[in-house]
Amino acid sequence: MSLAGKEFKLSNGNKIPAVAFGTGTKYFKRGHNDLDKQLIGTLELALRSGFRHIDGAEIYGTNKEIGIALKNVGLNRKDVFITDKYNSGNHTYDGKHSKHQNPYNALKADLEDLGLEYVDLYLIHFPYISEKSHGFDLVEAWRYLERAKNEGLARNIGVSNFTIENLKSILDANTDSIPVVNQIEFSAYLQDQTPGIVEYSQQQGILIEAYGPLGPITQGRPGPLDKVLSKLSEKYKRNEGQILLRWVLQRGILPITTTSKEERINDVLEIFDFELDKEDEDQITKVGKEKTLRQFSKEYSKYD
């Protein structure tokens, strides 16, 4: 894939806006169903400010808010990129996954909540799927995504939080397509969620999407990058969040971030207005490796 302007080109030739607004983390409902009016307003502001990529998921419980915001703003459907994810459950295989029979059925239900006929990208949220816990294995789960794509319910399909082994299980199977995206936690303090996953994904033409890209300044202080980011912020006349997001982008990775503040929304969109020198990009990469910060998916901490 390649970055051209404000878009990445996926391995299947389709394009994806190069930064996404996330509706998880602080907006994650954790089981309650009350409509989040603040999120609706924030999404409307983000869309009106120029965001064209909204990242959602079944487990976040925010699809109705996304749908309402889209309707209120009134953009042409083709001009907005919507991501959804199948709730596959956690690493304990405890049965607490999607209430729907399979990923295909889950997407159809999510589309009703979104008020849409299709999503632009549909992902398996976690690889924790087995015949015992779900009634189908990981490869069969992928075939449900292929069915959704073939029927026009999802324009692109991919995965999230997959290891090399997980990816190989799909790539080595006799499937009709391969994932175009692997969405993982990625930041300067976590440059591989699991061993070798970024390089391997990119070698296979799979775009890495990064959640948690601002960890070094939101949860990683004090840290070895503090002085580096301060100097680069002064050099480029950009704030430290913009420096980190631009670094992610220049690594060929799509950053996902979120905020409720108007100035921060505009800050994110300005990462396309400057470029880090190669030596500065490399310095962030090198110094970032001096610390490990894992904000999510703590089951992967065995690799730290």
UniProtKB/Swiss-Prot annotation:
Pfam families: Aldo_ket_red. It catalyses: (R)-pantolactone + NADP(+) = 2-dehydropantolactone + NADPH + H(+); isatin + NADPH + H(+) = 3-hydroxyindolin-2-one + NADP(+). It is an enzyme of class 1 (oxidoreductase). GO terms for molecular function: 2-dehydropantolactone reductase (A-specific) activity; aldo-keto reductase (NADPH) activity; oxidoreductase activity, acting on NAD(P)H as acceptor. The active site is at Y60, H125. Optimum pH is 7.5. NADPH-dependent conjugated polyketone reductase with broad substrate specificity and strict stereospecificity. Reduces ketopantoyl lactone (2-dehydropantolactone) and isatin. Does not act on menadione, p-nitrobenzaldehyde and pyridine-3-aldehyde. This is NADPH-dependent conjugated polyketone reductase C1. It comes from Candida parapsilosis.
